[in-house]
Amino acid sequence: MSFPATSPSLSSYNQLQSLDIPDAARRYRRFSNVSDAVSRKLSTTLGWRTVSIQEVVTQAKSLCGQHIRAWLKRRGLFTRKLGLQRLRSVASLPGGLAVCDVFVQLEGLSLELERKHPKLYSGVCRQMGVAVVTEKTIAKNLSSMAHNIFKKDITWFKVASFYNLVSAAAVDCVRQGHPEYLYGLVEAAGLVIERDVANWIANQGGWVSEQEGQNQ
């Protein structure tokens, strides 16, 4: 699996960039509300378990925080001063211990990808062409790369790869003296999941289905 090292200019993403933030947020909420309504109707009719988009996104952000924490610890960069304690524990979120199990599976996929493609997840800011590291520029480039990753199809390996990119960017931020950007990266990852992946995850049955679909 190989993804572009640079962040291309994508017309659909540029259109999103042209929207002001409140307008974009309203559109995201409207799409999410419609999706939730359809899911509830199908659940009532067919007996499917309803997994809300908000539940998926909330858990995605917590998983992202845990993922970043694990990457920093493996590189000897994690301290309590980094601010990740602001994130709620995975165990306290809807899904509880099951989501903790999801994190173990997610880490397994992430480590496998990192072993196979070490250069892809090293110096991510440089690969994205970010000359001046700011929270906004990193979030913008991650969003563009994510759009390119998920535009054709979505798999759990691609989700794990996106998390690797976010965590690699977090490593770059800490090494360049900007640990205060980490929480913003988690928020940016949450927006990407909501925009590109949340509906797919919900249709799979939520994050817990990752344990069954990790070989996709």
Give the residues covered by each predicted segment.
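Alpha-helical bundle/repeat cores within regulatory domains of eukaryotic proteins
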Residues: 143-216
